């Protein structure tokens, strides 16, 4: 096993566990693995060679040692470390696999779709100054927002700090984490009970053996019983500490989940769903190609007002055609029909103007001149439209 693999393993455990789990990992590495590897081997290396019995009967000493220690202390603790750490290693492997799969899926989605520039529509006042109709027409134009600026804005936003529990829940690993925690606790309890029944709380200085092939009860003596007793009690304490950390972590997960649910409910009560959207005073923008019409002041509904509205609508249609389809190849096939409708609209407008002027000033000489001028203007406009070379130019 290389150091890089061990470093990667510890980093992943650090990222996918709570702060109580990190304490448990520290206790496992320092007080179990290191202590068993360094202290256990040096204390128990001569446990069988220094096990001496006061008999010369062949095989009696081996049988008595088997009765005294059915399983070596060091091997028992190594087996305990392996089984206790197995649920955590399995959880870690599952977490790495799931997160790598999620990242791979997100990378495929990003590669499938292109990265368009973020566009914002702003009002430009300089374009309005080139027109001569003295009307307020909102002009919109797109503004490109670079992707780097967008990423910088996202990075500048402060993220809430957490101890790992919320990250486990966001990654969908909470159930697996709780299962491995329960399995780890069960292993701790099982090994604690087994250690008590195998070794008790003390290593006695001598052991009385009466098993076959020993001819009678004999006394066997153990080397360094006090040192081994102290080390045995230390291992009891480490096992109890790990068990308490497991219980603490379960309480931490339970109370933390309850607290998060209560906080979410309180936020829902404080911030109703109907008012979750932010209020803004910005003027709503329109997509490209969308004409925003300003609502005019209401005037008295007469034939003249109706004719003016029709004239303005025709003028807006002509301006839109000149803006988006001024080329000859884009003109419709029924151009003559369009010209005929425009002439009819102009004639109706002239008649409405004459009727309106006649209604207001029935005996004024200026009215006659206006009528003659309007008729001459209408004749000129009709003549110009007939003599045109196929373009929709109108003289008024």
Curated annotation (Swiss-Prot):
Compartments where located: Cell membrane; Cell junction, Gap junction
Keyword RNA-binding among UniProt keywords: no
Biological processes per GO annotation: cardiac muscle tissue development; cell development; cell-cell signaling; chemical synaptic transmission; gap junction assembly; vasculogenesis; visual perception
Biased composition (Low complexity): 373-396
Start-end of Basic and acidic residues biased regions: 147-156
Membrane-related topology note: Multi-pass membrane protein
Topology Extracellular: residue spans: 46-75, 199-228
Membrane-spanning residues: 23-45, 76-95, 176-198, 229-248
Keywords: Cell junction, Cell membrane, Gap junction, Membrane, Transmembrane, Transmembrane helix
Cytoplasmic side stretches: 1-22, 96-175, 249-396
Residue ranges of the region described as Disordered: 145-165, 357-396
GO MF, any single term: monoatomic ion channel activity
Any Pfam family: Connexin
Function of the molecule: One gap junction consists of a cluster of closely packed pairs of transmembrane channels, the connexons, through which materials of low MW diffuse from one cell to a neighboring cell.
Assembly information from the UniProt record: A connexon is composed of a hexamer of connexins. Interacts with CNST.
Family: Belongs to the connexin family. Gamma-type subfamily.
Stated name of the protein: Gap junction gamma-1 protein
Lineage of producing organism: Eukaryota, Metazoa, Chordata, Craniata, Vertebrata
């Amino acid at each position: 096993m290389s150091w890089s693999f061990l470093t990667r393993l510890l980093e992943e455990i650090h990222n996918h566990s709570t702060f109580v789990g990190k304490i448990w990992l520290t206790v496992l590495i320092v007080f179990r693995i290191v202590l068993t590897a360094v202290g256990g081997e040096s204390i128990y290396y001569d446990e069988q060679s220094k096990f001496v019995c006061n008999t010369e009967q062949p095989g009696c000493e081996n049988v008595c040692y088997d009765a005294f220690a059915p399983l070596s202390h060091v091997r028992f603790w190594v087996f305990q470390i392996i089984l206790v750490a197995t649920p955590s290693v399995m959880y870690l492997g599952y977490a790495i696999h799931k997160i790598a799969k999620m990242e791979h899926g997100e990378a495929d989605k990003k590669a499938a779709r292109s990265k368009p520039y973020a566009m914002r529509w702003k009002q430009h006042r300089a374009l309005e100054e080139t027109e001569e109709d003295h009307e307020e027409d909102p002009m919109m134009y797109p503004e490109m927002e670079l992707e780097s600026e967008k990423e910088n804005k996202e990075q500048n936003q402060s993220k809430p700090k957490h101890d790992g529990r919320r990250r486990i829940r966001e990654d969908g690993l909470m159930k697996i984490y709780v299962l491995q925690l329960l399995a780890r606790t069960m292993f701790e309890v099982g090994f604690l009970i087994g250690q008590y029944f195998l070794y008790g709380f003390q290593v006695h200085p001598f052991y009385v053996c009466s098993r076959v092939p020993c001819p009678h009860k004999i006394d066997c003596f153990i080397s360094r019983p006090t040192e081994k007793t102290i080390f045995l009690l230390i291992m009891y304490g480490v096992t109890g500490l790990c068990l308490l950390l497991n219980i603490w972590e379960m309480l931490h997960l339970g109370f933390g989940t309850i607290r998060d649910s209560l906080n979410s409910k309180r936020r829902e009560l404080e911030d109703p769903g109907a008012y979750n959207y932010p209020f803004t005073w910005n003027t709503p923008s329109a997509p490209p190609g969308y004409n925003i019409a300003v609502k005019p002041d209401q005037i008295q509904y007469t034939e003249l007002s109706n004719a003016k509205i029709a004239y303005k609508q025709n003028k807006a249609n002509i301006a839109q055609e000149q803006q988006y389809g001024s080329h000859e190849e884009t003109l419709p096939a029924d151009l003559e029909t369009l010209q005929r409708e425009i002439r009819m609209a102009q004639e109706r407008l002239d008649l409405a103007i004459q009727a309106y002027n006649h209604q207001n000033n029935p005996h004024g000489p200026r009215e006659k001149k206006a009528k003659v001028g309007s008729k001459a203007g209408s004749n000129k406009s009709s003549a110009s439209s007939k003599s045109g070379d196929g373009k929709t130019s109108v003289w008024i």
